[in-house]
Structures are given as C-alpha cells and as structure tokens.
C-alpha cells in the first residue's frame, strides 16, 4: 500500500500528516510505528490523520498516533498547529478559524497573519479521576505559592538518583506531571522521565515535564512524552507547565516557553478560561512511501 504524506514540524516536534478526507485509512499500530521509525520509515514523533467530521458545526476530526508505540492518544498541541496549517495550505479549508474534534475534546485553531497558529486548547482539567491520577494515601507537599487547592504531590521513585520528586498534576486533554527544576540542561530527564511516565499513580501513563522558571514571564521546558520519549517540544506540556506555574503563584498569565525546538507563547486567564497556545508550524517536505507487508515491529 502506497501512502502520500506531508512531513511537518512545530518547534521541532515533528509529524507525518496523512489526508483521510477523501478516503478512509485503515492502518494498524505497526503501520504507524513504521511511519514514525527514523531508520526504516519517514520518522516522526507522532502521525496525524486528517478526517472530515460528522459532528454538526465541527470541520475536521484530528487523530494522533505515537510514532514510537503506534497507540492513539488524546491530544498534541504542536500537532494541532501543524494540522491547522495543513488544512489551510492544502485547500481543505479557507476559514480563518477551524474547529476540530479529537478523541475527547473540541479545539479551535486560528492561523495568524504572520503564519503562526494559535490553538484554543480548552480549559485544563484538575480532577484527579479525570486525569487520571491516583492520589489515595498521598499527602500534598507544602509550597510557597498560592495554589488555592492546587498542590504538589510526591512520587516515590525507588532506585533512582532522585528517590522522590514533587509534581503538579493536570490534564490538557492528556495527562501531565510537571516538576520544577533548577536547570533543565542538567535535569535527569532521561532517567527520571520514563520512571514518572510509567508510575503506578498514573494508570494511563503520563507526560513528564521538567520546568525551569526564569522569570514570571519566561520558562524553559523539557518534556518526556508518553509513548514517544523526550521530544524537542510538547505543546500540551507547555500549556500544562504554565497553568501549573500560574496556579502555584510562580508565573504571570502570559508566558514565553523556551523549548529545545523553539518558542511557544502560552496564555491563561485562570479558572473557567481556556488555555491559548501560539507558535510556529511548517511543512518540511512531502512524499510517498510504500507500507511493508509486515511493518517494522
């Protein structure tokens, strides 16, 4: 089977984008792993599938598959910006604002005049059962912020160089655990990231964020993504980090997030308001690829 694809990137988070608006795609997890493979396939953090929506008032369905595992996931912020540019650049929609549905939410995308894309990421989710996060038996850590019920939670990591880390827990349509670090360059992301990702307190696993606060309007961030490992940028991770920082009293309502792949701007007016993410989205190249009869396992 031959597929036409578009390779895109948003702040270094890279994607294979597939157009399924004209004909449905029936790909397996092994097929998505093959497309994401950087040696045998195209290479990408995630594979994005563009489908028409059957929901009234919604323009497209946005599906996301991890390039490493082939599993479908709930949300990807950097991918959402690339999704918006793809439908605009390929003539699928000429609307300034596009509404799309994911597996668990609706989001609105806006292509700015300068080519950047702003995504309305909806309101963050703090209820532990909905993240999901099991806090049974845990005692929240004291902190110097003003969380108003939003707390830091200790995670025990037996055998790690850091036997315990304190994390802020929330969902941006997908689960996040954010910890504050002194220096993201020296933070043990490769060691601690996978331990947090697969921690038993997160029954569906979690994206592990490492945030360095530079000022009330600027942070540096690294994210070990669920099912993908560390990526150059994570849009939902940037949103989660800023929301956590605001609720803990560390950050102002609009913050520049410096990732290894580029700059994202996150704005959140507080409880009851959506999170707005603005950043770049670019097409790298297009091509065609034959799926092997037996995809790389």
Curated annotation (Swiss-Prot):
SUPFAM superfamilies: Diaminopimelate epimerase-like (SSF54506). It catalyses: (2S,6S)-2,6-diaminopimelate = meso-2,6-diaminopimelate. Pathway: Amino-acid biosynthesis; L-lysine biosynthesis via DAP pathway; DL-2,6-diaminopimelate from LL-2,6-diaminopimelate: step 1/1. InterPro entries: DAP_epimerase_DapF. Keywords: Amino-acid biosynthesis, Cytoplasm, Isomerase, Lysine biosynthesis. GO terms for biological process: lysine biosynthetic process via diaminopimelate. It is found in: Cytoplasm. Its main location: cytoplasm. The record marks 176, 225 as: Could be important to modulate the pK values of the two catalytic cysteine residues. The active site is at residues 76, 234. GO terms for cellular component: cytosol. Its EC number is 5.1.1.7. Signal peptide: none annotated. Pfam families: DAP_epimerase. It comes from the Bacteria. Substrate binds at residues 13, 46, 66, 77-78, 174, 207, 225-226, 235-236. Catalyzes the stereoinversion of LL-2,6-diaminopimelate (L,L-DAP) to meso-diaminopimelate (meso-DAP), a precursor of L-lysine and an essential component of the bacterial peptidoglycan. Belongs to the diaminopimelate epimerase family. HAMAP family: DAP_epimerase. Homodimer. This is Diaminopimelate epimerase. It comes from Leptothrix cholodnii (strain ATCC 51168 / LMG 8142 / SP-6). The gene is dapF.
């Amino acid at each position: 089977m031959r597929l036409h694809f578009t390779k895109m990137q948003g702040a270094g988070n890279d994607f294979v984008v597939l157009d399924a608006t004209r004909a449905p795609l029936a790909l397996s997890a092994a097929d998505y792993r093959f497309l994401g493979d950087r040696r045998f396939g195209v290479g990408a953090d995630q594979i994005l599938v563009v489908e028409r929506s059957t929901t009234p008032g919604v323009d497209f369905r946005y599906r996301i598959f991890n390039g490493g595992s082939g599993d479908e996931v709930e949300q990807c912020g950097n991918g959402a910006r690339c999704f918006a540019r793809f439908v605009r650049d390929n003539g699928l929609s000429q609307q300034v604002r596009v509404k799309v549905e994911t597996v668990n939410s609706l989001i609105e995308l806006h292509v700015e005049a300068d080519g950047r894309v702003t995504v309305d990421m909806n309101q963050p989710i703090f209820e532990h059962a909905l993240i999901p996060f099991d806090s049974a038996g845990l005692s929240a850590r004291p902190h110097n912020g003003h969380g108003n019920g939003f707390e830091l939670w200790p995670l025990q990591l037996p055998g790690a160089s850091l036997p315990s880390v304190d994390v802020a827990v929330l969902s941006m349509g997908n689960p996040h655990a954010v910890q504050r670090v002194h220096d993201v360059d020296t933070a043990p992301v490769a060691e601690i990231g996978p331990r947090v990702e697969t921690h038993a307190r997160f029954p569906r696993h979690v994206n592990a964020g490492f945030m360095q606060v530079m000022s009330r309007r600027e942070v540096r961030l690294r994210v070990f993504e669920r099912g993908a490992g560390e990526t150059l940028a994570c849009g939902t991770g940037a949103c989660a980090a800023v929301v956590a920082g605001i609720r803990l009293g560390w950050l102002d309502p609009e913050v520049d997030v410096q990732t290894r792949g580029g700059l994202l701007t996150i704005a959140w007016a507080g409880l009851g308001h959506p999170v707005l993410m603005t950043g770049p989205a670019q097409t790298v190249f297009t091509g065609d690829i034959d799926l092997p009869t037996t995809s790389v396992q």
